Amino acid sequence: MGIQNRVALITGSASGMGKQTALRFAEQGAAVVINDIDAEKVRATVDEFSARGHRVLGAVADIGNKAAVDGMVKQTIDAFGRIDILVNNAGMERAGALRKLSEADWDVTINVNLKGTFLCTQAVHGHMVENKHGRIVNIASRAWLGGAGQTPYSSAKAGVVGMTRALAIELGRAGITVNCVAPGLIHTPMWDELPEKDQQFLLSRQPTGKLGEPDDIANTLLFLADDDSGFVTGQVLYVCGGRSLFAG
Protein backbone atom coordinates (compact mmCIF):
# COMPACT_ATOMS: atom_id res chain seq x y z
CA MET A 1 0.00 0.00 0.00
CA GLY A 2 2.94 2.36 0.54
CA ILE A 3 2.70 5.87 1.98
CA GLN A 4 1.09 7.70 -0.92
CA ASN A 5 -1.12 10.57 0.30
CA ARG A 6 0.02 10.04 3.88
CA VAL A 7 1.25 13.01 5.96
CA ALA A 8 4.67 12.65 7.58
CA LEU A 9 6.15 14.92 10.24
CA ILE A 10 9.91 14.41 10.39
CA THR A 11 11.89 16.28 13.02
CA GLY A 12 15.40 17.49 12.27
CA SER A 13 14.69 17.12 8.56
CA ALA A 14 16.43 20.14 7.06
CA SER A 15 19.75 18.28 6.70
CA GLY A 16 21.43 14.88 6.87
CA MET A 17 19.43 11.70 7.45
CA GLY A 18 16.26 13.61 8.18
CA LYS A 19 16.35 15.51 4.91
CA GLN A 20 17.06 12.38 2.89
CA THR A 21 14.20 10.61 4.65
CA ALA A 22 11.83 13.49 3.90
CA LEU A 23 12.89 13.38 0.26
CA ARG A 24 12.31 9.62 -0.01
CA PHE A 25 8.89 9.97 1.61
CA ALA A 26 7.96 12.84 -0.72
CA GLU A 27 9.09 10.82 -3.74
CA GLN A 28 6.72 8.08 -2.62
CA GLY A 29 3.79 10.49 -2.60
CA ALA A 30 3.61 11.61 1.02
CA ALA A 31 3.16 15.20 2.16
CA VAL A 32 6.13 16.03 4.37
CA VAL A 33 6.73 18.51 7.17
CA ILE A 34 10.29 19.81 7.37
CA ASN A 35 11.28 20.67 10.93
CA ASP A 36 14.43 22.23 12.29
CA ILE A 37 15.37 24.91 14.79
CA ASP A 38 17.25 26.74 12.01
CA ALA A 39 14.72 28.82 10.04
CA GLU A 40 17.09 29.40 7.12
CA LYS A 41 17.71 25.68 6.63
CA VAL A 42 13.99 24.97 6.81
CA ARG A 43 13.22 27.64 4.23
CA ALA A 44 15.91 26.37 1.85
CA THR A 45 14.71 22.77 2.13
CA VAL A 46 11.06 23.72 1.61
CA ASP A 47 12.02 25.73 -1.49
CA GLU A 48 14.02 22.78 -2.83
CA PHE A 49 11.19 20.30 -2.30
CA SER A 50 8.57 22.67 -3.69
CA ALA A 51 10.65 23.15 -6.84
CA ARG A 52 10.52 19.38 -7.33
CA GLY A 53 6.74 19.41 -7.10
CA HIS A 54 6.45 17.83 -3.66
CA ARG A 55 3.81 18.71 -1.06
CA VAL A 56 5.81 20.25 1.77
CA LEU A 57 5.41 22.43 4.83
CA GLY A 58 8.13 24.10 6.89
CA ALA A 59 7.87 24.10 10.69
CA VAL A 60 10.54 25.92 12.67
CA ALA A 61 10.40 24.60 16.23
CA ASP A 62 12.58 23.60 19.16
CA ILE A 63 11.41 20.06 19.88
CA GLY A 64 12.52 20.36 23.50
CA ASN A 65 9.88 23.04 24.07
CA LYS A 66 6.31 21.80 24.61
CA ALA A 67 4.61 24.96 23.37
CA ALA A 68 6.72 24.93 20.20
CA VAL A 69 5.95 21.25 19.57
CA ASP A 70 2.22 21.74 20.13
CA GLY A 71 2.31 24.67 17.71
CA MET A 72 4.12 22.59 15.09
CA VAL A 73 1.55 19.80 15.33
CA LYS A 74 -1.33 22.28 15.06
CA GLN A 75 0.35 23.91 12.05
CA THR A 76 0.63 20.51 10.37
CA ILE A 77 -2.98 19.51 11.00
CA ASP A 78 -4.21 22.94 9.87
CA ALA A 79 -2.28 22.52 6.61
CA PHE A 80 -2.89 18.85 5.80
CA GLY A 81 -5.79 17.76 8.02
CA ARG A 82 -3.95 14.96 9.77
CA ILE A 83 -0.63 13.37 10.74
CA ASP A 84 -0.14 9.73 9.75
CA ILE A 85 3.59 9.31 10.32
CA LEU A 86 5.94 10.75 12.93
CA VAL A 87 9.68 10.27 12.58
CA ASN A 88 11.52 11.46 15.69
CA ASN A 89 14.82 12.07 13.95
CA ALA A 90 16.21 15.25 15.56
CA GLY A 91 19.24 14.59 17.72
CA MET A 92 22.62 15.81 18.86
CA GLU A 93 25.57 14.60 20.90
CA ARG A 94 27.90 16.06 23.52
CA ALA A 95 30.73 13.58 23.96
CA GLY A 96 33.60 13.48 26.42
CA ALA A 97 35.06 11.79 29.47
CA LEU A 98 32.74 11.76 32.47
CA ARG A 99 34.98 14.07 34.50
CA LYS A 100 34.87 16.69 31.74
CA LEU A 101 31.14 16.69 31.03
CA SER A 102 29.12 19.60 32.35
CA GLU A 103 25.56 19.63 33.60
CA ALA A 104 24.71 21.66 30.49
CA ASP A 105 26.15 18.89 28.27
CA TRP A 106 23.86 16.39 29.99
CA ASP A 107 20.79 18.61 29.90
CA VAL A 108 20.95 19.56 26.22
CA THR A 109 21.61 15.97 25.13
CA ILE A 110 18.66 14.62 27.12
CA ASN A 111 16.45 17.56 26.10
CA VAL A 112 16.87 17.07 22.35
CA ASN A 113 17.19 13.30 22.08
CA LEU A 114 14.83 12.04 24.78
CA LYS A 115 12.52 14.84 25.89
CA GLY A 116 12.01 15.95 22.29
CA THR A 117 10.96 12.45 21.26
CA PHE A 118 8.53 12.30 24.19
CA LEU A 119 6.98 15.71 23.50
CA CYS A 120 6.49 15.10 19.78
CA THR A 121 4.99 11.66 20.35
CA GLN A 122 2.70 12.94 23.08
CA ALA A 123 1.53 15.78 20.84
CA VAL A 124 0.57 13.59 17.86
CA HIS A 125 -0.62 10.38 19.49
CA GLY A 126 -4.12 11.60 20.40
CA HIS A 127 -4.74 12.55 16.79
CA MET A 128 -3.53 9.12 15.65
CA VAL A 129 -5.73 7.38 18.23
CA GLU A 130 -8.76 9.21 16.84
CA ASN A 131 -7.86 8.05 13.32
CA LYS A 132 -7.08 4.50 14.51
CA HIS A 133 -3.87 4.60 12.50
CA GLY A 134 -0.34 5.80 13.04
CA ARG A 135 3.29 5.04 12.39
CA ILE A 136 5.83 6.37 14.88
CA VAL A 137 9.50 5.70 14.23
CA ASN A 138 12.16 6.87 16.66
CA ILE A 139 15.82 7.27 15.84
CA ALA A 140 18.04 5.75 18.50
CA SER A 141 21.66 4.80 17.84
CA ARG A 142 23.94 1.84 18.17
CA ALA A 143 25.33 3.93 21.04
CA TRP A 144 22.36 2.95 23.22
CA LEU A 145 24.31 -0.24 23.87
CA GLY A 146 27.01 1.92 25.49
CA GLY A 147 30.19 3.60 24.39
CA ALA A 148 33.16 5.23 26.11
CA GLY A 149 32.81 9.00 26.24
CA GLN A 150 29.13 8.83 25.29
CA THR A 151 27.44 8.81 28.69
CA PRO A 152 24.77 11.47 28.00
CA TYR A 153 24.11 10.28 24.44
CA SER A 154 24.01 6.58 25.31
CA SER A 155 21.69 7.33 28.22
CA ALA A 156 19.36 9.38 26.03
CA LYS A 157 19.22 6.81 23.26
CA ALA A 158 18.69 3.95 25.72
CA GLY A 159 15.76 5.98 27.00
CA VAL A 160 14.42 6.26 23.45
CA VAL A 161 14.55 2.48 23.09
CA GLY A 162 12.71 2.00 26.38
CA MET A 163 10.11 4.59 25.37
CA THR A 164 9.62 2.84 22.03
CA ARG A 165 8.87 -0.48 23.69
CA ALA A 166 6.56 1.00 26.31
CA LEU A 167 4.56 2.97 23.73
CA ALA A 168 4.30 0.00 21.38
CA ILE A 169 2.45 -1.82 24.16
CA GLU A 170 0.34 1.18 25.15
CA LEU A 171 -0.72 2.24 21.66
CA GLY A 172 -0.88 -1.05 19.79
CA ARG A 173 -4.63 -1.58 20.08
CA ALA A 174 -5.22 1.89 18.66
CA GLY A 175 -3.67 0.88 15.34
CA ILE A 176 -0.41 2.69 16.05
CA THR A 177 2.97 1.04 15.59
CA VAL A 178 6.04 2.36 17.40
CA ASN A 179 9.47 1.23 16.28
CA CYS A 180 13.06 2.31 16.56
CA VAL A 181 15.94 2.49 14.11
CA ALA A 182 19.46 2.36 15.54
CA PRO A 183 21.95 3.72 12.99
CA GLY A 184 25.66 3.11 13.20
CA LEU A 185 28.25 5.18 11.37
CA ILE A 186 26.36 7.25 8.80
CA HIS A 187 27.78 9.95 6.54
CA THR A 188 26.10 13.04 7.99
CA PRO A 189 27.25 16.56 8.98
CA MET A 190 27.96 15.16 12.48
CA TRP A 191 30.42 12.69 10.94
CA ASP A 192 32.13 15.40 8.90
CA GLU A 193 32.80 17.38 12.08
CA LEU A 194 34.87 14.56 13.61
CA PRO A 195 38.68 14.80 13.46
CA GLU A 196 40.16 12.53 10.79
CA LYS A 197 41.98 10.39 13.36
CA ASP A 198 38.67 9.69 15.10
CA GLN A 199 37.03 8.81 11.79
CA GLN A 200 39.79 6.35 10.95
CA PHE A 201 39.59 4.73 14.40
CA LEU A 202 35.84 4.26 14.13
CA LEU A 203 36.04 2.84 10.62
CA SER A 204 38.71 0.38 11.75
CA ARG A 205 36.11 -1.17 14.08
CA GLN A 206 33.42 -1.34 11.42
CA PRO A 207 32.83 -4.87 10.01
CA THR A 208 31.98 -3.46 6.58
CA GLY A 209 34.90 -1.03 6.72
CA LYS A 210 32.75 1.79 5.38
CA LEU A 211 30.14 4.36 6.32
CA GLY A 212 26.46 3.99 5.77
CA GLU A 213 24.65 6.64 3.76
CA PRO A 214 21.53 8.62 4.73
CA ASP A 215 19.56 6.65 2.13
CA ASP A 216 20.26 3.45 4.09
CA ILE A 217 18.35 4.96 6.99
CA ALA A 218 15.67 6.52 4.80
CA ASN A 219 14.83 3.19 3.18
CA THR A 220 14.47 1.50 6.57
CA LEU A 221 12.22 4.28 7.81
CA LEU A 222 10.15 4.00 4.65
CA PHE A 223 9.57 0.32 5.38
CA LEU A 224 8.46 1.00 8.95
CA ALA A 225 6.17 3.87 7.88
CA ASP A 226 4.46 1.80 5.21
CA ASP A 227 0.81 0.83 5.66
CA ASP A 228 1.84 -2.79 5.07
CA SER A 229 4.15 -2.82 8.13
CA GLY A 230 1.32 -2.88 10.66
CA PHE A 231 2.47 -6.12 12.32
CA VAL A 232 5.94 -4.75 13.12
CA THR A 233 5.99 -2.86 16.41
CA GLY A 234 8.19 -2.43 19.48
CA GLN A 235 11.30 -3.38 17.51
CA VAL A 236 14.81 -1.96 17.27
CA LEU A 237 16.22 -2.28 13.75
CA TYR A 238 19.99 -1.86 13.56
CA VAL A 239 21.27 -0.19 10.40
CA CYS A 240 24.92 -0.14 11.34
CA GLY A 241 26.98 -2.31 9.00
CA GLY A 242 27.35 -4.90 11.76
CA ARG A 243 28.81 -2.48 14.31
CA SER A 244 26.28 -3.57 16.95
CA LEU A 245 28.00 -6.97 17.06
CA PHE A 246 30.83 -5.44 19.07
CA ALA A 247 30.77 -3.70 22.45
CA GLY A 248 32.24 -0.26 23.08
UniProtKB/Swiss-Prot annotation:
The active site is at Y153 (proton acceptor). It comes from the Bacteria. Keywords: NAD, Oxidoreductase. InterPro entries: NAD(P)-bd_dom_sf, Sc_DH/Rdtase_CS, SDR_fam. SUPFAM superfamilies: NAD(P)-binding Rossmann-fold domains. It is an enzyme of class 1 (oxidoreductase). GO terms for molecular function: oxidoreductase activity, acting on the CH-OH group of donors, NAD or NADP as acceptor. Involved in an anaerobic toluene degradation pathway. Active subunit that catalyzes the oxidation of 2-(alpha-hydroxybenzyl)succinyl-CoA to 2-benzoylsuccinyl-CoA. In vitro, can catalyze the NADH-dependent reduction of the artificial substrates 2,2-dichloroacetophene and 2,4'-dichloroacetophenone. NCBIfam families: PRK07231.1, PRK12826.1-2. This is (2S)-[(R)-hydroxy(phenyl)methyl]succinyl-CoA dehydrogenase subunit BbsD.
